[in-house]
């Protein structure tokens, strides 16, 4: 199934939490930090403000950091995604 977000919305897929700390300690269950890093899988066309089209700054494939309490979680074809507004994306990770 393909998903196409509307307006200035973006579909992201969370990246997996780290299994191990830098010092080599294996993390299990609730000890893993919830990731706020994700990969962009779909991007809306942008929005129109006062008759001016606002282009999207992110593109498919970008790795991004997003606000902790934003977006809507959805499940499609057994995969979990989040749909959020571009304004809830804090940075692009290069």
Swiss-Prot record:
<comment type="similarity">
    <text>Belongs to the GroES chaperonin family.</text>
</comment>
<dbReference type="GO" id="GO:0005737">
    <property type="term" value="C:cytoplasm"/>
</dbReference>
<dbReference type="GO" id="GO:0044183">
    <property type="term" value="F:protein folding chaperone"/>
</dbReference>
<dbReference type="InterPro" id="IPR020818">
    <property type="entry name" value="Chaperonin_GroES"/>
</dbReference>
<dbReference type="GO" id="GO:0005524">
    <property type="term" value="F:ATP binding"/>
</dbReference>
<dbReference type="InterPro" id="IPR037124">
    <property type="entry name" value="Chaperonin_GroES_sf"/>
</dbReference>
<keyword id="KW-0143">Chaperone</keyword>
<comment type="function">
    <text>Together with the chaperonin GroEL, plays an essential role in assisting protein folding. The GroEL-GroES system forms a nano-cage that allows encapsulation of the non-native substrate proteins and provides a physical environment optimized to promote and accelerate protein folding. GroES binds to the apical surface of the GroEL ring, thereby capping the opening of the GroEL channel.</text>
</comment>
<dbReference type="GO" id="GO:0051087">
    <property type="term" value="F:protein-folding chaperone binding"/>
</dbReference>
<dbReference type="GO" id="GO:0046872">
    <property type="term" value="F:metal ion binding"/>
</dbReference>
<dbReference type="InterPro" id="IPR011032">
    <property type="entry name" value="GroES-like_sf"/>
</dbReference>
<dbReference type="Pfam" id="PF00166">
    <property type="entry name" value="Cpn10"/>
</dbReference>
<comment type="subunit">
    <text>Heptamer of 7 subunits arranged in a ring. Interacts with the chaperonin GroEL.</text>
</comment>
<dbReference type="GO" id="GO:0051082">
    <property type="term" value="F:unfolded protein binding"/>
</dbReference>
<protein>
    <recommendedName>
        <fullName>Co-chaperonin GroES</fullName>
    </recommendedName>
</protein>
<dbReference type="GO" id="GO:0051085">
    <property type="term" value="P:chaperone cofactor-dependent protein refolding"/>
</dbReference>
<dbReference type="InterPro" id="IPR018369">
    <property type="entry name" value="Chaprnonin_Cpn10_CS"/>
</dbReference>
<keyword id="KW-0963">Cytoplasm</keyword>
């Amino acid at each position: 199934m393909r998903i196409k977000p509307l307006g200035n919305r973006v579909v992201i897929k969370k990246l997996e939490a780290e299994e191990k700390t830098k010092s080599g300690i294996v993390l299990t269950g609730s000890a893993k930090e919830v990731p706020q890093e994700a990969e962009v899988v779909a991007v809306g066309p942008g929005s129109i403000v006062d008759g001016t089209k606002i282009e999207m700054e992110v593109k498919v494939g970008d790795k991004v950091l997003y606000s902790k309490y934003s977006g809507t979680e959805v499940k499609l074809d057994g995969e979990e995604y989040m749909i959020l507004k571009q304004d809830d994306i804090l940075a692009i990770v290069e």
